[in-house]
């Protein structure tokens, strides 16, 4: 098991009647505890925040954490929730001499208590990147009150705002990208009054109005080349329509889209007539880890929104010349929607360059509203499809990212309720096998349910991002 440590969780419910002092549940059942979030059988990094959980409807639960056959600590929780002591949790995960780790829990479900069957948590020796960044926004259609880009420390529960729309008079703040997981080099868009694209490099910030740079088109979906200097953008004319008597009430779609490459050293926007014309719609650029190949999605134009269900995006790639900023003559089609069916969006290549993860829906370019949208993975060595079924659900899976080690992925999913996108983490083995996804840990397990905002565009970052807020505000005066 690659020197992983196996944590087995034995959970039992204990509902105390008035005046009862019993600590041992009276009845044992051969069933896993109905904990929320579901952490049974997941593989977690050795530096992850505590996996606090609850049993809904319980008044008290008690969890015993056992490692190597001996009890390490016990955590008691009122109102049905367990808050694991962080120091004890870290010590448990760091115990490299333990071949097997078992966790036992007693939860409150009946007056006399119930002891549940144990469940396992597998602890990987592979750490996860310290931070993730994401946007939080109400899942509305046209309007919003507040949105922002945030960072979360995955080793604890700290969350900080990087930038929100108070800096640009409540305009849209979106589409962040980091250069090669660096907390010191990033960009984001801020629309509205005095808007522009903000580039951050080593503590210095610069706002650029891409729409005033020939060819006078605004950048939308970005990805910074891992080697620096260049940023690939798609420029999208996006709209949405609402439909009655249809299983899907709204469709977000492009009416045109092209590719552009911005040279951060010269301030020039580079275009290629093959990918900047009315002949095709190109979107979602993504670089290979060495920065020498650009992947992107491409579709034949249709009359929108009437022909929305016939729009299907292929997955293409082209070589990139870093010296000139030009794309090569050869263009490969990796996924042909005419023969394979479906529509591709959000391509992302693993750090070792072997795998490419993408989102596949029946049609279109905005899978967030498509319940059938799933994550798919391609082996770039031979073009075969890798089994990613462990990651998917009956609701929409959408944007995603690889960790810098390639051993973890984060992705957005609506599996909880079909309305809000929340973030899930999953392990990746060296041979491309995905572990059971688990919900982003929170100090209070209910936070995942009562936070009425959607997460999108999760990105791993190697360390803390520091943006001087005063300087940010000054950019938009």
Language model features: what each stretch is:
Residues 8-17:
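Bacterial N-terminal signal peptides
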Residues 18-477:
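Sequence signature of WD/YWTD-type beta-propeller architectures
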